[in-house]
Amino acid sequence: MGQKVNPNGFRYGITKQHNAIWYAEKKDFSKFLLEDQKIHQFFEKLVRQYLIGKVEIKRDQKGRVFVGVHSAKRGAMLGQEGKNIQTLTASLQKFLRQKNKDIKIDVINIDQPELNARLLAEQIAVDLENRKPFRIAQKFAIRNSLKAGAKGIKTAVSGRLNGVDMARTEGYTEGEMKLHTLRQKVDYAQATARTTYGAIGIKVWVSLGEILDGGKQ
C-alpha cells in the first residue's frame, strides 16, 4: 500500500536546504531544539500580519542566534528606521524568557508571494474564514500561482465543507506535479481555517520545475 510522505522532509539535505543550520553538543542539543520550536511559534502568530512564508534559524559558536524571516511585507515588518524590528526582537527575547539573548532578525523580501506554498495556503484559509466558497478560493490561488510562473500546483481542503454534516476532502491539480522526483523543486505547506462549522485543513503543493545542476534551493 502506498504511503504519503511530507514533500519538504523528503527533499531536505538533497535538493532543499534545512531551515535550521547549527551544530550543538549532546548536552545543549535539546535546549537549542526547544528554542527553535519557540521561535517558530512566535512567528506563527505573525504569519498573516506580515505574510511570512518561511523562517530560517542559524547559530554560531558564540551562542548568537540569527533568524531569517522571509516576508512579503518587508517594509511593514522593518518599520520606520527599523524600529518595528527592534520591538519584535525584544518581544522574541521576552517570549523565550532570555532578555540577554543575542538575537538578530534579518527580514528577507519575498518577491513572488504567489509561488510560496505557505502564503497560498494562508490565503485560502483567510478566504474560507471570510465565507468564500472553497472551490472558488482554491481556483483563485491556482490561477494566481500559474500566472506568476509555477510549473504546477495542487491544493486540497478537508473538513465540513460548506457546513455539511459529513467531512470530506476536495482538491485540484493543474500543471506538472512530480512528487516522486527528488530533483523536482516542490514547495509544500499546510494551514488551518477556523470557520463557524469547525476547522478546515488546507494543503498546498507548488512545483517550480526541476533542479538540473544538483544545487540546493
Curated annotation (Swiss-Prot):
The keyword Ribonucleoprotein applies. The keyword Acyltransferase does not apply. GO terms for molecular function: mRNA binding; rRNA binding; structural constituent of ribosome. Keywords: Ribonucleoprotein, Ribosomal protein, RNA-binding, rRNA-binding. One of its GO terms (biological process) is translation. It holds the Pfam family KH_2. One of its GO terms (cellular component) is cytosolic small ribosomal subunit. Residues 39-111 form the KH type-2 domain. InterPro entries: KH_dom-like_a/b, KH_dom_type_2, KH_sf_prok-type, Ribosomal_S3_C_sf, Ribosomal_uS3_bac-typ, Ribosomal_uS3_C, Ribosomal_uS3_CS. Binds the lower part of the 30S subunit head. Binds mRNA in the 70S ribosome, positioning it for translation. Part of the 30S ribosomal subunit. Forms a tight complex with proteins S10 and S14. Belongs to the universal ribosomal protein uS3 family. This is Small ribosomal subunit protein uS3. It comes from Mycoplasmopsis pulmonis (strain UAB CTIP) (Mycoplasma pulmonis). The gene is rpsC.
